[in-house]
């Protein structure tokens, strides 16, 4: 995984609420003395014994949004929970949806030519079908662009 990809994953994790937890009584109880942890958005402590620095901890513990379907799903849910985030994300992936819709319209045109195939014809190009076809990397890249755009917009408005 490239440094740019990993940095994007860490940026998204921080935006979603992942936080650094320094060694202390709470971390010692779960993992032992001197262990650095991250707290995920659900409040669970996450650690790895392979981390030699705080930066290394972020590299090893945060979700790999570019690769994991489960991380993609959590990211989509988090984006959808806020109207501004979702709108910014939607604006980023709109061009991808147009390509997806054009592809399915071509398939529909083929089915239209064959009367016997009408029963299995796609009636609607659904938004949910589109989201499922996006790769984790496409979602992560679009989410990062959307969130950075929102951050820049907020900076201009203050």
Locate predicted features.
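Glycine-rich anion-binding surface patch
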Residues: 1-158
